[in-house]
């Protein structure tokens, strides 16, 4: 089991660019580009940049598989701002987070490709998603709890983004751009699922 754990850890480091980020940040320190005190911040920033690039590349690749490239970009553009402030379910490791995100995008694009969303389906999905966001957001994590002020700020921003995206979605449907509107609709639906899962995860953690 120790060997398996070591292999998993090594895979996680490779996938999340930990070693490469460390090497680049140390080279900046050696050249005097940054101070030693800024090393950790620089390393984290580089790793986040690599992670964002990897996730974007993965999103585009999945979009190409389904023939829905611009839809994958629009979904991601609508989902990330909401996710940033609403919170929700978080995987225990960066590798799991990557694969869960890839699976979510694949499921969403499969729905866009193969499942029709008539008005009588879209309206209930939107209403349920809105109720869940208004009731649950923000959903914190056990290792990064939010204080009362942060909760108010995050809740306000999540609701504001939700309202703006709702107006954009309605406008797209009004212009008969149903596919684009459905991308935003499914970003809201995906977020509501993550909020519910995150709330369950937090409750389970507190009981453990």
Locate the predicted segments by residue.
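Interfacial aromatic-anchored transmembrane helix boundaries in multi-pass membrane proteins
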Residues: 84-111
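Structural signature of hydrophobic alpha-helical transmembrane segments
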Residues: 63-76, 122-129
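Cytoplasmic-side transmembrane-helix entry/capping segments in multi-pass membrane proteins
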Residues: 93-103, 122-126, 150-155
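N-terminal juxtamembrane cytosolic/stromal segments of multi-pass membrane proteins
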Residues: 13-46
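Hydrophobic alpha-helical transmembrane segments in multi-pass integral membrane proteins
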Residues: 108-119, 163-178
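C-terminal ends of transmembrane helices
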Residues: 79-91, 137-145, 196-199
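Small-residue-rich transmembrane alpha-helices that serve as helix-helix interface/gating elements
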Residues: 182-196
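Membrane-helix boundary/juxtamembrane motif in polytopic membrane proteins
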Residues: 141-163
């Amino acid at each position: 089991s120790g060997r398996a754990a070591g292999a998993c850890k090594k895979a996680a480091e490779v996938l999340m660019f930990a070693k490469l980020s460390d090497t680049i940040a140390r080279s900046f320190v050696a050249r005097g580009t940054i101070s030693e005190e800024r090393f950790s911040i620089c390393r984290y920033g580089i790793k986040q940049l690599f992670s964002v690039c990897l996730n974007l590349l993965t999103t585009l690749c999945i979009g190409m598989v389904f023939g829905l490239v611009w839809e994958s970009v629009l979904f991601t553009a609508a989902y990330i701002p909401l996710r940033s402030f609403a919170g929700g379910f978080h995987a225990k490791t960066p590798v799991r987070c990557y694969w869960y995100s890839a699976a979510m995008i694949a499921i969403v694009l499969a729905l866009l490709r193969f499942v029709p969303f008539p008005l009588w389906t879209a309206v209930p999905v939107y209403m349920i998603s809105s109720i869940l966001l208004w009731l649950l957001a923000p959903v914190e994590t056990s290792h990064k709890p939010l204080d009362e002020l942060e909760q108010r700020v995050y809740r306000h921003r999540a609701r504001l983004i939700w309202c703006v995206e709702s107006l954009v979605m309605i406008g797209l449907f009004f212009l008969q751009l149903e596919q684009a509107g459905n991308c935003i609709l499914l970003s809201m639906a995906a977020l509501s699922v993550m909020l519910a899962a995150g709330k369950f995860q937090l409750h389970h953690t507190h009981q453990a």
